[in-house]
UniProtKB/Swiss-Prot annotation:
Name of the protein described by the UniProt record: 1,4-alpha-glucan branching enzyme GlgB
Organism expressing this protein natively: Nitrobacter hamburgensis (strain DSM 10229 / NCIMB 13809 / X14)
Catalysis performed (reactions): Transfers a segment of a (1->4)-alpha-D-glucan chain to a primary hydroxy group in a similar glucan chain
Keyword Ribonucleoprotein (UniProt): no
The enzyme's E.C. designation: 2.4.1.18
Amino acid sequence: MIELSSEARAIVEGRHSDPFHYLGRHRENDRQVVRAYLPEASDVRVVDEHGGETTLTRIHDAGLFLGDLPNGAKRYRLRARFGADTVELEDPYRFPPILSDFDLYLLGEGTDQRLYDKLGAHPITMDGVGGTGFVVLAPNARAVAVVGDFNCWDRRRHPMRVRGNGYWELFIPGAQTGDRYKFAITDKSGSLLPLKSDPMAFAAEVRPNTASIVVDEAALPCPTPAAATINARRAPISIYEVHLGSWRRGDDNRWLSYRELADTLPRYASSLGFTHIELMPVNEHPFDGSWGYQPTGLYAPTSRFGSPDDFAHLVDACHREGLGVLLDWVPGHFPDDPHGLGHFDGTAFYEHANPLQGRHLDWDTLIYNYGRTEVVNFLVANALFWLDRYGLDGLRVDAVASMLYLDYSRAEGGWIPNKHGGRENLEAIAFLRRFNREVFAKFPHATTIAEESTAWPQVSRPIEFGGLGFGYKWNMGWMHDTLDYIGKDPIYRKHHHGQILFGLHYAFSENFILPLSHDEVVHEKRSILGRMPGDDWQRFANLRAYYAFMFGHPGKKLMFMGAEFGQEREWNHDHALDWHLLDQARHQGVQAVVRDLNALYRDVPALHELDCDPAGFEWIMANDADRSVFAWMRKGESGRARCLVIANFTPTVHRSYRVRVPFAGKWREALNTDSAHYGGSNVGNNGVVETLDGVIPELSLTLPPLAVIFLVPERA
């Protein structure tokens, strides 16, 4: 055996950061030599493009081979014997770099919006040879190798080379779509880390397995676009929030696939008049019980329900039904599973090293380091990826409050102030603004939505005016106050009248969405129906009235699956919704009123055009606490676009109830939640009411019990 150089020993010991410097073809004086590292091979020969063959000398028992390549040969292959098998291989170390110098410049600047075109695993052809290019960021690693189906998961076979700024790359001939792979990383001290999934993987194995899967994501079908105005401030936006794993299930409680869901979900949501479907996170995640909110694969649709192509089919099916598709997106934290982002290159790279900054106490997860350029680029590019590759129409950003505050859920002394001594996370603020700026610049018809549970100002206001730049914000205060109010016995509601009024004091401070989300039907909070007081008749009447109150209130709408037909029990992610309830008339009535409310909201401009504008709302009756009656006028952009909404939150019928209106003449009762069609007592105003004689136009109305009525002027 030849005495090994230090470089050769580094190859054999798996700690070489640039194996191309030693392996492959090299000129030494007047010779062309080939070095190959093929552990377990007993014999290796080099075959040039002319058919010439040279036997390489084994220079180390670990599988290091050396020999001459005939002068003038430009291409060659390796013919190796493994036991009784002889295979012919392309040498990965004869190919040029994957990343260009300009690529490395953009990556170093952290401004590459299409990071996903360069990092990860991409099937490509180099020098006429098909294979897969692998690129991963691990700046603090001593060595990185690719392991997978193509090399028997042998970390010795395919060491990568490091380029500028810690990007490691390798083209592996023959690696193809469908191959599983991971990265084998050696840290600075020489210790082997647990095998890591690719942070940029476009697909992964079904849990509990954690390997990444090679996918040609550039070949995904071009999505059918949604209408350009679907997210507009003046448009009706009614969102159906869905957890794909529990909306419906198949035989033996199995998950439905993306394609099975595509056959039913879009048509169902569209038939009820919803304008959007919001998907709880589909990013790959290891734990079902996280509902997707602890992702390890931000670029991969979960394989629980199928392939990336299958997911694209579902999005396309939604668009063909006229639905926008929103995705819950989690850039605030990630789990510390060994195969994931935590301690990725042997250091706290994606997360903060200090647990006072880097660990989320509520969820025992890791917090992204928004001060690191590469991490911010990774996250922003991920947002753009979903809008670009899958044609999604918007992103709902989860847990924004936990990102904005350094002391979120932390006791005194358990957090580190910012450079000004404050509690605001300045780096997270900068990240959110950059995220919104780049999303709207590249996808002007998309939207972004913040789940922000505090009074942080200007969340949905322009960045140039000091805002965070979101398109919309969930109105968590409205949700908490109104659910608390409607959950009280009607006899006590007069003492809590202000809970309804208070929301209108700030209803136009943001572009609000009124959310009845999944968070309100778990953890012993009960279902929305389960919160309603009284006997069965009153519970269902309360529910119908509450939904109508929401649709009459300023703000866009969101309803979690199951609420639309009065799901009785809390949501359980391990089981389908209780669809059998629709065999009962009272649940059919709830579904019918939701369908009609969506239609009314869409068809009456006054109910949606000025959802986010104070000009679109006027109190008509706000101080009738004794009777728990509220009346208000919704207004559209045109002069006669009006809709009168009156809510009676007691079981008492109020007759001859006088309400002032802006126009004399006939007003049509457009919807009455007490209609027998919905399971109500059918008290109402016989379809049309005419104003009384007098200087000021007034209506004399019958207010049905525990009900909301909508009236619009004839010829409006």
